[in-house]
Structure formats: structure tokens, C-alpha cells
């Protein structure tokens, strides 16, 4: 079995989805416009699958997140909120063990989020997983 290339690995794809969701939320652009800027990702099946899955379930994911946080979802850090959305999509798919999903979420939060953001992401995901 061949290893995924660096540009199409699941880890890299998650990072690119996070970047795309960030651009969508802060830039106010439409998904098609942002995808034009990420033309190199168009052939990346995993990237497209996650992005589509998160986009199609955004309202439901936000409702779930809101149930487990102590402030309005609009006040959450954009990066951490989108990491939670990606994680909820992967939990919904049930293809990966929840510990892998949490580890990936923590990795992204440490890399892209606020200094203590990974603790918040970990705590919220832990509550969601324990409740399900």
C-alpha cells in the first residue's frame, strides 16, 4: 500500500478545509468562489468530502456545539468553532475512532488556534462524545 502524498494526506486535507471554512466565515465569500482560490484541492477527494459534509450540516453542527458551550456560538473563536465542526463531521461519519478525531482536533487547535484553544476544543469534544 502506498502512503498518501503530502498534499493529499488526511491531515493536510483537514488543515485545508479549516483554512477554507475560515475564509468563508470571515471573508463572506461563497463556497464556489473560495474553491476557485483552492483549485489545487479540487482533485482531493478527502478535502471535498469534508468541506461538503461540514457545509451541508453547518446548522446542525452549530446547534450541537451550542449545547456544550457556555456562550453564544457567534462569540467562539472562528478557528476553534471550525475545528469543532470538522470534528463533528468526522464523528458523524464513524469511520475513525473518536480518539483519533480528538487528537487531530487538538493538533489543529495547537497549530492554528489561540494559545489555550486546544483545551477548549478538547473539553467540548469530550463532552459531546460522552453524551452520545
Where would I find each of the regions flagged by the language model?
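N-terminal interaction/assembly modules
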Residues: 1-111, 115-118, 122-132
Amino acid at each position: 500500500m502506498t502512503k498518501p502524498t503530502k498534499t493529499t494526506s488526511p491531515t493536510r486535507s483537514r488543515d485545508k478545509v479549516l483554512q477554507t471554512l475560515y475564509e468563508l466565515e470571515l471573508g463572506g465569500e461563497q463556497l464556489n468562489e473560495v474553491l476557485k482560490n483552492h483549485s489545487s484541492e479540487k482533485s482531493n477527494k478527502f478535502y471535498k468530502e469534508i468541506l461538503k459534509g461540514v457545509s451541508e450540516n453547518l446548522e446542525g453542527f452549530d446547534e450541537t456545539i451550542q449545547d456544550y458551550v457556555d456562550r453564544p456560538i457567534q462569540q467562539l473563536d472562528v478557528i476553534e468553532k471550525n475545528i469543532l465542526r470538522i470534528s463533528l463531521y468526522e464523528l458523524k461519519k464513524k469511520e475513525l475512532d473518536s480518539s483519533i478525531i480528538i487528537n487531530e482536533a487538538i493538533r489543529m487547535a495547537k497549530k492554528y488556534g489561540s494559545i489555550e484553544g486546544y483545551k477548549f476544543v478538547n473539553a467540548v469534544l469530550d463532552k459531546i462524545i460522552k453524551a452520545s
